[in-house]
């Protein structure tokens, strides 16, 4: 009987340990995937990355404003592949605070909003020269049914501060919803981690302010660099504890008097988000042919005019000699 009970408890402990280990592994893998793929935040929470005001939703999490640029051809022919180059400049020497509190290199990401009908070029349509510019980047559609909206990132900023998107222009002959017009292209690009998560909570890449005014009675440094700051409010005698995540530099000390919303930490953010736009013309080949024919006609007319003038001058000269 004693042997049976020992076996049962041993088996139960092993099963519990195994279940906890599996759950922990699933959590780590899932969290790592989410934290390393921040475009998924926008994809999960917004049907369209561009709001009615023109603001790209990535700005909701990346609060600092930084520049971004896009280069596209002035005009393209239907059913041709062209480059859309997104430039996300920043100082390569900068280091950001990572989720684990350590310092690391900045990543970059971008969202490209193309006109309806434009989409990512298939691999067999991309030239070797363009493939070399693209490198090992892997683009994805914002939604399966929104092939004109592309996202990329996070990718190493030191290698991909310029991102080349291979784009296939539509053909109005096969797509009746597309016309030979001038179209806008919108782009958003970020470097570094965001300051706010989609649920409204702060990351450790932003400033933390005091949630109450009073005297700092205690600063406790806990495991992994997390701080607990206890603020004693003299007006009502209550105590407030502010939690500061790891990786941040404190600006206050014990015994210091602080005000409501006073910064408790320095601002660690060295990145930011920017958005821009460009225009592209889907050119009708017949218009190009017509323009070439017109220019050729003008050149020929000029040549015949010069020849006629020389012939007239010769006739005049011969009459004068006669």
UniProtKB/Swiss-Prot annotation:
Any Gene Ontology CC annotation: chloroplast thylakoid membrane
Cofactor descriptive note: Binds 1 heme group covalently.
Source species, domain of life: Eukaryota
Membrane topology listed for this record: Single-pass membrane protein
Pfam annotation, one family: Apocytochr_F_N
Cofactor(s) of this protein: heme
Cellular localization per UniProt: Plastid, Chloroplast thylakoid membrane
Biological processes, Gene Ontology terms: photosynthesis
Metal-binding in keyword set: yes
Keywords: Chloroplast, Electron transport, Heme, Iron, Membrane, Metal-binding, Photosynthesis, Plastid, Signal, Thylakoid, Transmembrane, Transmembrane helix, Transport
Signal peptide: 1-35
Any one GO MF annotation of this record: heme binding
Broad class of the protein's primary localization: plastid
Transmembrane feature ranges: 288-308
PANTHER family listed in its UniProt record: CYTOCHROME F, PTHR33288
Family membership: Belongs to the cytochrome f family.
Reported function: Component of the cytochrome b6-f complex, which mediates electron transfer between photosystem II (PSII) and photosystem I (PSI), cyclic electron flow around PSI, and state transitions.
Known partners and oligomeric status: The 4 large subunits of the cytochrome b6-f complex are cytochrome b6, subunit IV (17 kDa polypeptide, petD), cytochrome f and the Rieske protein, while the 4 small subunits are PetG, PetL, PetM and PetN. The complex functions as a dimer.
Protein name, as recorded: Cytochrome f
